């Protein structure tokens, strides 16, 4: 190969490389979700919420979502969201973090939850209610649910809802959250192009 051929080859590769690099960078960019303020009721409160770096994950920090000595407390959370145009919600992962104290000889504690979607941006929940029973103490438990959304809609606004309750038996305790207020519930959305 002579110097002229090498120069032409180098020029062609440089031009092609310059065109491919921005294209590759643009295709790797992830779509982001806009989250509204999380609202909780009747017997819990949202202390804070944090959007993850991927803009598809929302961490919700609670206050007073606990039950002890035979109590049952419920917490209903609603979050308005905007799904970007050209995308639909495919799957979701919801991670609960908490602690429970279950002395030997007691009936234990439980965490129950179900999910609802309001509006076309999410479609229909394809998941049944879940209950996790704890029969021993655990300073930091993690329970993760994976749910599928069946949406024909492409982008738009919607509301994601969690209906959760914690149940204790006499002499037991359960809380969603931890003393250092690390994230209690993390909600992650997987999106698909439509």
Predicted regions located by residue number:
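C-terminal segment of classical bacterial N-terminal signal peptides
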Residues: 16-24
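N-terminal leader/pro-regions and domain N-caps
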Residues: 24-68
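Short beta-strands within extracellular/lumenal beta-sheet-rich domains
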Residues: 71-85
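A short beta-strand element within beta-rich, extracytoplasmic domains
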Residues: 88-102
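Short, surface-exposed beta-strand/strand-loop-strand elements in extracellular ectodomains
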Residues: 104-121
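Short, surface-exposed tryptophan/glycine-enriched loops
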Residues: 126-158
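Internal, hydrophobic beta-strand segments that form the core of beta-sheet-rich folds
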Residues: 154-171
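Proprotein-processing/basic-patch segments
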Residues: 168-194
